């Protein structure tokens, strides 16, 4: 996949504005209808004050919002957080709405609008995360909701590093048994680091954890942004689904190419050759 440069989507839609004192017992809840016109790739922004040193989490349906960081630690001069809508995130927002959680800060505004291109059904997370000295990006486990790992060959971690001489560790937990790969076992390019899933049971690896962690050390070069976590589908899975959908107008298939009568659960589906996220 070739990631396109960030682009501005004209217009912004205000979702909520006011002053809400957020703490763990006083969540700010936004109804699903407020996100009816939101699109994949749109940027969702939560503005706040008095949050320096605090932690903010974005939830939906009582759990973490897919496609987001596990927690946002707020810097002294920071007045907002922004996330970019993956298909899974959008599905949750439009069905369950948004819950802004955290410890002792004032939420002031929520809106969505200008965003990024290059986000599709295989995008688990997209955004900008600064990698410096042993920085760790933690994305929520349910960012992979609906994924059939039997049809995924690798995970690509895109960045703006423009080089390969940095340290990267991909982990599900700290300590023994949590490391999935590093720069010595992954394919390193100037555009991305790729973790092959050959020999890795991702379903089992994620079963008893709540996040996937990407840790980097810039080494001798400059710090850089991580920009996207993308799944790589096996060619056989894509070809198999395409062949079936060419013959079946509005038939519904799972991402693995199995025909179903209707959509019974959340996940990725294909109708008439086009992928979409079932709610």
Question: Where do the PLM segments sit?
Answer:
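Extracellular ligand-binding interfaces
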Residues: 11-92, 97, 101-233
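Sec-dependent, cleavable N-terminal signal peptides
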Residues: 1-12
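C-terminal outer-membrane/trafficking sorting elements
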Residues: 237-279
């Amino acid at each position: 996949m070739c990631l396109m440069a960030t682009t501005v989507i004209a217009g912004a839609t205000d979702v909520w504005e006011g002053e809400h004192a957020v703490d763990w017992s006083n969540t700010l809840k936004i109804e699903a209808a407020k996100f009816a016109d939101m699109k994949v790739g749109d940027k969702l922004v939560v503005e706040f004050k008095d949050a320096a040193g605090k932690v903010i989490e974005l939830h939906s349906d009582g759990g973490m919002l897919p496609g987001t960081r596990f927690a946002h630690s707020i810097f002294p001069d920071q007045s907002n957080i922004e996330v970019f809508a993956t298909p899974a995130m959008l599905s949750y927002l439009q069905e369950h709405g948004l819950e802004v959680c955290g410890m002792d800060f004032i939420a002031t505004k929520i809106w969505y609008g200008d965003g990024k291109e290059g986000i599709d059904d295989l995008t688990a997370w997209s955004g900008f995360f600064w990698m410096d000295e042993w920085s760790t990006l933690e994305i929520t486990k349910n960012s992979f909701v609906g994924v059939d790992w039997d049809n995924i060959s690798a995970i690509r971690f895109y960045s703006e590093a423009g080089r390969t001489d940095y340290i990267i560790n991909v982990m599900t937990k700290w300590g023994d048994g949590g490391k999935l790969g590093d720069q010595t076992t992954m394919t390193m390019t100037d555009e991305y680091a790729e973790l092959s899933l050959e020999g890795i049971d991702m379903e089992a690896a994620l079963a008893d954890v709540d996040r996937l962690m990407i840790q980097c050390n810039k080494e001798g070069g400059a710090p850089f942004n991580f920009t996207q976590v993308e799944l790589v589908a096996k060619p056989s899975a894509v070809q198999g689904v395409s062949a079936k959908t060419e013959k079946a107008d509005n038939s519904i298939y799972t991402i693995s190419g199995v025909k179903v009568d209707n959509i019974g659960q959340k996940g990725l589906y294909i109708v008439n050759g086009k992928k979409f996220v079932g709610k």
